[in-house]
Amino acid sequence: MIQLKVPAHSAMDNNIEAEWASSESYDLDTWTVFIESLPYVKSARFVFMSSFKDVSYTLITFDSEEHKTWFILRYS
């Protein structure tokens, strides 16, 4: 399972940079996140453009870390 943590402070930008962090053995660089609908809607879709293919993720929850809010996105 792949999960990405996206800083929520960039939520209203047209695109944001997602630095990851995977629990699996994937070598992920910084991916650009394109917001297809409002990010605070749980059904919002995020498309991560990589050098080899396009991968769609769905926002599943919110989390708080060191007083910063993150979007937790899981591969679907």
Q: PLM ranges: what are they?
A:
Residues 1-57:
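Structured alpha/beta or helical-core interaction and ligand-binding surfaces enriched in interleaved
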Residues 49-76:
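Short, compact, well-ordered microdomains
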